[in-house]
Amino acid sequence: MNDQRKGSDAEPTTHFGYKNVPESQKAEKVAEVFHSVAAKYDLMNDLLSGGMHRLWKRFAIELSGVRTGNRVLDIAGGTGDLTRKFSNLVGPTGQVVLADINASMLKVGRDRLLDLGVSGNVEFVQADAEKLPFPDNHFDCVTIAFGLRNVTHKEDALRSMLRVLKPGGRLLVLEFSKPTNKLMSKAYDAYSFAFMPLMGKLVTNDSESYRYLAESIRMHPNQETLKSMMVEAGFDRVTYHNMTAGVVALHRGIKP
């Protein structure tokens, strides 16, 4: 977090993309972005990743170890890609909670999953990752895919996720990260700051939201920093896997 004070009584600031804003305003500004993009979120994911996001999520599911009867929390679950798969894995004796802080994204996810016939073992909850409204030691697995970079206090969110996991439970963080070679990094910068806003303008008439998304990716901690944050939060056996030359990384940690 970028905590800056202009005086002893000044409110701490944090980054919103490349801008510094008062901490109390970040959640509202992020909400505005996702209210704007919710209706075409799936379409834009496919266009901007060339469908690769489905492969990244599939790998996260394979590494989750989720099985019949488990309880799973899908934070920032959005339109429900992971929740849908987990619903099949846990079966009628398990439970999946799709949690999202954004009401528009939550509605799109609920409507989409109901249209696909996913119900019975899925619950939808509007929740803040920093203050999860669930009991201690409740879930076998917690996932957050492409959501942690939008959280104001990432350390608080990681500790909240640790709290709700059962001992031995797994946290998986799937997030855009730092490319592992200079050529990919340069190409990815050009793609992110030129192509993403352009596609946002053409498809959703909203280039600014996609400019923020590109900036938020650059401001997110790199692979080793996020690993250290997870260890500091209390997770054991923290590892990460780079995908697409580090454009995306999947971090995994275990609750002791």
Curated annotation (Swiss-Prot):
Keyword S-adenosyl-L-methionine: yes
One GO process term, biological-process aspect: menaquinone biosynthetic process
Top enzyme class: transferase
InterPro entries named among the record's database cross-references: SAM-dependent_MTases_sf (IPR029063), UbiE/COQ5_MeTrFase (IPR004033), UbiE/COQ5_MeTrFase_CS (IPR023576)
Organism: Pseudomonas savastanoi pv. phaseolicola (strain 1448A / Race 6)
Chemical reaction(s) catalysed: a 2-demethylmenaquinol + S-adenosyl-L-methionine = a menaquinol + S-adenosyl-L-homocysteine + H(+); a 2-methoxy-6-(all-trans-polyprenyl)benzene-1,4-diol + S-adenosyl-L-methionine = a 5-methoxy-2-methyl-3-(all-trans-polyprenyl)benzene-1,4-diol + S-adenosyl-L-homocysteine + H(+)
Pathway: Quinol/quinone metabolism; menaquinone biosynthesis; menaquinol from 1,4-dihydroxy-2-naphthoate: step 2/2; Cofactor biosynthesis; ubiquinone biosynthesis
Name of the protein in its database record: Ubiquinone/menaquinone biosynthesis C-methyltransferase UbiE
Chain sites annotated for binding S-adenosyl-L-methionine: 79, 100, 128-129
Pfam families: Ubie_methyltran
Annotated EC: 2.1.1.163, 2.1.1.201
Protein family according to the UniProt entry: Belongs to the class I-like SAM-binding methyltransferase superfamily. MenG/UbiE family.
Role of this protein: Methyltransferase required for the conversion of demethylmenaquinol (DMKH2) to menaquinol (MKH2) and the conversion of 2-polyprenyl-6-methoxy-1,4-benzoquinol (DDMQH2) to 2-polyprenyl-3-methyl-6-methoxy-1,4-benzoquinol (DMQH2).
A molecular-function term among this protein's GO annotations: 2-methoxy-6-polyprenyl-1,4-benzoquinol methyltransferase activity
Keywords: Menaquinone biosynthesis, Methyltransferase, S-adenosyl-L-methionine, Transferase, Ubiquinone biosynthesis
